[in-house]
A protein has these predicted regions:
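Beta-strand-rich domain onsets/edges
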Residues: 20-41, 45-51
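Short, ordered, surface-exposed loop/turn motifs in non-cytosolic proteins
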Residues: 40, 48-64, 88, 137-153
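A short, solvent-exposed loop/turn motif at the edges and junctions
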Residues: 62-68, 90, 94-111
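The canonical Cys-X-X-Cys-His
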Residues: 174-185
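Short, conserved, GDST-rich strand-edge loop motifs in beta-rich repeat architectures
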Residues: 186-194, 295-298, 365-396, 436-464, ...
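Structural signature of eukaryotic scaffold interfaces centered on beta-propeller domains
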Residues: 268-289, 342-360, 420-428, 486-505, ...
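Conserved beta-propeller blade signature
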Residues: 292-296, 362-366, 428-434, 507-511, ...
């Protein structure tokens, strides 16, 4: 069944959920000195001309430590706040909240009470400047359903490959521009004067998408949509925003959302962006207590950045690669950037995408270690068991491992490409790799590799083969472009984007991108190269047998019960429970749309696009998700959490109620996560011993609030029992 979202409002003293902009109460102001605090805290009351301000943020920032540092809390229903456990330093504090403009910045030190004066926004326009990007992006007009299929550049401007409105939505969201950065922030909803002068806004947009080293990628995305119509729609949006059209107001934090404490550290340089971070062995959330946090920079640099959250410092470690490893991005810009001109700022060969920590505290990354041509043992004619079944001529990324104890890297040559990676909970500590551009899945037996350092012997891969003859074992198969043969199995041409071993039964799951997209299950069997069997479950779309409709998964994770969680470009957080399937899971009819009953969709928070199909959810973009299997945050076990890339947030879902808790990062605006994990530093320390870790991961940190020169931040989220807990 479809479950509509609610912004969670569960408070220890029980207040009801509120929607729309919260209106501050006028309860009696409690003196700041009466709020219990210690020498490392700052506490007080926030009031405006209308009285105490509930559900607004208090930001404490300092540059006195080893790197830029800030802590952010939310006021309670009486406007009271407490910023806990601040390192000794001088801080700047101010108030930010919906319906307000930023207050004057005040200097303060821990241990002293401080009341703050909030400022009511003089106009709706000024208030809206603090709204998340997706609220502005929701003003974009989506072409009506009657305009699809597209008729090409000489027709209605929509590509004739875009058959329906949902595909257009997919491309304006996660599988297009917003796989890299927000659309709707100030940097994108306006046209910078530095871009040049143009006769029309559509011409300005057409020039804008050609900027920098990735101009070719942006043009390709526009062409997939239909460049002519895409530029017209974006120009219309920009013109309406310039003329004064405003988005709806987001709600202020409510209930448990007011108990969230956010800590940030600046890390890396202004030209570097992050893709993923890791703080812990995901299989043991008590590992690496208070330890270093690691992040990698994909196409922007050849470093791994390391945060020490105890010392409040960061450092960088060069990632090695062999001579001949190509650059990840073109060495020349397509057209000058309005920020960097002709300078190519993305300089990377390793293009390290994702990383995982193992039980020894080592860091494994999906990174390029060499040129694209595979060694002979991967190819046709090799005696490698996997190459005999499915030879591979080339790969774009391989893997490497960094040992913090020895401070040494080791390159591990892989045949199957890597993008995301995940350890299984098995005796071999098997590391599984996704390969979204391929049609196979690869793995590394790290126990064997540790014993032998023989990459050839320790790895394997397999194609995806459906058991279409239904006999429960893998047989000879027909190819993807061949019709089903009832006596054989069938290979399907899919590639995992996300990848994850199920803790429930050891099966391997992944998402496959596209429209409507799918999740795929792989049962490895006793000899995965020869025995692995796949099952494919498409997201229900235009399926009359389905009670829910959605499309285009991207990120994915699995709970301890084996339930799959994935975020959809249709504006939903979805679960897939294979145990709910009523029909055959294999055989000639099990080709994708055969288990709609396994899917449950939850509409994500925020407004919808203008003119969109009523089945489509919010305009927000959700890139990835993670399941808090072990209650590292404080909401309980098996809580799925999505990145809310257009609304500066993480969103935790309670599956029992269908309600979301929105963990908004209000400053600097532009929080755009692609990964997260959770760690328990001290199981006896209550909320202070727990926390979620993530990072700003936009490819364009110069689009963040503060503009050019602003760096990415590591972000820790904690949930205390009430807004004044110390």
């Amino acid at each position: 069944m479809t479950k509509k979202f609610f912004y969670v409002a569960v408070v220890a003293i029980a207040i009801a959920a509120l929607f729309g902009v919260s209106r501050p109460g006028h309860s009696a102001k409690k003196p700041a000195a009466a709020i219990p605090m210690n020498s490392s805290d700052i506490a007080g009351v926030v009031t405006s001309s209308k009285g105490p301000e509930a559900g607004v943020w208090v930001i404490a920032e300092t540059k006195d430590l080893g790197t830029g540092y800030r802590k952010i809390v939310v006021t309670d229903d009486q406007g009271r706040y407490l910023v806990p456990d601040l390192p000794k330093a001088n801080y700047t504090l101010w108030v930010r909240g919906y319906g307000l403009v930023d207050s004057a910045k005040v200097q303060a030190a821990p241990g002293k009470p401080l009341d703050l004066k909030a400022v009511i926004a003089p106009s709706a326009k000024e208030a809206a400047q603090y709204y998340p990007a997706a609220y502005w992006y929701s003003l974009l007009h989506i072409p009506p359903k009657s305009d699809f299929p597209g008729t090409g550049p000489n027709g209605n401007g929509i590509s004739d490959n875009v058959k329906e409105q949902g595909q257009w939505v997919e491309l304006v969201k996660t599988d297009g521009c917003e796989s890299c950065h927000q659309i709707g922030d100030k940097a994108t909803r306006e046209i910078p004067s530095s871009l040049g002068a143009f006769d029309t806004t559509a011409a300005a947009w057409d020039r804008r998408i050609q900027s920098a080293q990735v101009g070719g990628n942006m043009v390709t995305t526009a062409n997939r949509m239909g460049r002519k119509r895409a530029m017209q729609e974006y120009a219309d949006w920009t013109d309406r925003v310039k003329a004064g059209e405003l988005p709806p107001a987001p709600p202020r934090p409510q209930g448990l959302e007011r108990n969230i404490v956010i800590t940030q550290w600046d890390w890396a340089g202004p030209k570097e962006y992050f893709h993923d971070e890791i703080s812990v062995d995901r299989r043991n959330v008590n590992s690496n207590p208070n330890g270093l946090v690691y992040g990698v920079h994909e196409d922007s640099s050849d470093f791994m950045t390391v945060l020490d959250p105890v010392k409040n410092t960061f450092s960088q470690i060069a990632i090695p690669y062999k001579p001949g490893t190509p650059m990840a991005e073109p060495e020349q810009v397509l057209e000058p950037s309005p920020y960097w001109g002709k300078e190519p700022v993305a300089i990377s060969h390793a293009t390290a995408h994702s990383l995982m920590m193992d039980s020894q505290g080592r860091i494994w990354t999906a990174a390029a270690t060499r040129g694209r041509e595979n060694p002979a043992f991967c190819k046709e004619g090799s005696n490698h068991p996997s190459a005999k079944v499915f030879p591979i001529a080339s790969s774009s990324r391989q893997t490497n491992v960094y040992d913090p104890k020895t401070k040494q890297w080791t390159l591990v040559d892989m045949c199957s490409s890597s993008q995301h990676l995940m350890f299984a909970e098995d005796a071999n500590n098997t590391l599984w790799f996704s390969d979204p551009g391929g049609d196979k899945v690869g793995w590394l037996n790290t126990k064997m590799w540790d014993a032998t350092h023989d990459a050839e012997k320790s790895q394997g891969w397999t194609p995806f083969v459906l058991d279409t003859n239904g006999n429960g074992k893998r047989d000879d198969y027909v190819e993807p472009d061949q019709p089903i043969d009832p006596s054989k199995d069938k290979r399907i041409k899919v590639g995992f984007y996300a990848v994850g071993p199920s803790p429930a039964d050891g099966s391997i799951w992944g998402t496959t991108l596209g429209f409507p997209g799918a999740v795929v299950r792989l049962n490895p069997g006793s000899d995965p190269t020869k025995t692995a069997l796949a099952e494919i479950y498409e997201v229900p779309w235009n399926n009359p047998k389905a009670s829910v409709q959605g499309f285009s998964p991207r990120g994915m994770d699995i709970d301890r019960n084996g339930v799959i969680w994935t975020v959809l470009a249709s504006g939903h957080f979805a679960s897939f429970d294979r145990r709910k399937c009523k029909g055959p899971l294999n055989g000639p009819t099990a080709t994708g749309q055969h288990c709609p009953e396994g899917w449950t969709l939850y509409r994500t928070p925020g407004p919808s696009f203008k003119g969109v199909d009523e089945r489509v959810g919010s305009a927000d973009t959700n890139y990835y998700n993670w399941v808090d299997q072990y209650d590292t945050f404080g909401l309980g076990k098996n809580i799925p959490i999505a990145t809310a890339n257009g609304t500066d947030a993480l969103e935790a879902l309670d599956p029992a109620t269908g309600k979301f808790i929105v963990m908004r990062v209000p400053y600097p605006m532009g929080f755009f996560a692609k990964s997260m994990d959770g760690r328990i530093d001290d199981p006896k320390a209550g909320w202070k011993g727990k926390g979620l870790w993530s990072t700003y991961a936009t490819r364009t940190p110069w689009h963040l609030e503060g503009g050019k020169g602003t760096t990415s931040k590591a972000v820790k989220f904690q949930l205390r029992p009430d807004p004044l807990a110390d």
